[in-house]
């Protein structure tokens, strides 16, 4: 177990050093951190980044959580880090949603 300070790029980079593949499972409430993780992954020479974009197709979306996920795809392209997106269908959006009871 490695403790990471997501507000500190060096902390994220240190945690990712020597890692070949990052599979992000960040919830919708924390998607803003995913860009920082991707940037640190690029600096740490991670070979493949899988963003937390499981569910329906989000490419080109501009609104809400789908817009945020689309923005991450743009950031990954700009960083030049290899990435893979697994579209599993819209049902996954409901299964993995954060619910407050």
State where each predicted segment sits.
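Oxidoreductase cofactor-interface core, primarily capturing Rossmann-like NAD(P)-dependent enzymes
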Residues: 1-17, 29-35, 40, 44, ...
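Redox-cofactor binding/interface segments in oxidoreductases and associated redox assembly factors
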Residues: 21-27, 51
């Amino acid at each position: 177990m490695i403790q990471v300070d997501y507000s500190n790029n060096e902390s994220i980079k240190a945690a990712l050093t020597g890692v070949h593949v990052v599979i992000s499972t960040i919830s919708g409430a924390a998607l803003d951190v995913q860009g920082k993780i991707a940037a640190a992954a690029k600096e740490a020479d991670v070979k493949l980044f899988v963003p937390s974009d499981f569910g329906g197709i989000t490419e080109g979306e501009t609104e809400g959580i789908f817009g945020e996920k689309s923005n991450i795809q743009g950031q990954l392209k700009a960083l030049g880090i290899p990435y893979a997106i697994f579209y599993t269908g819209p049902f996954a959006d409901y299964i993995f949603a954060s619910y407050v009871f």
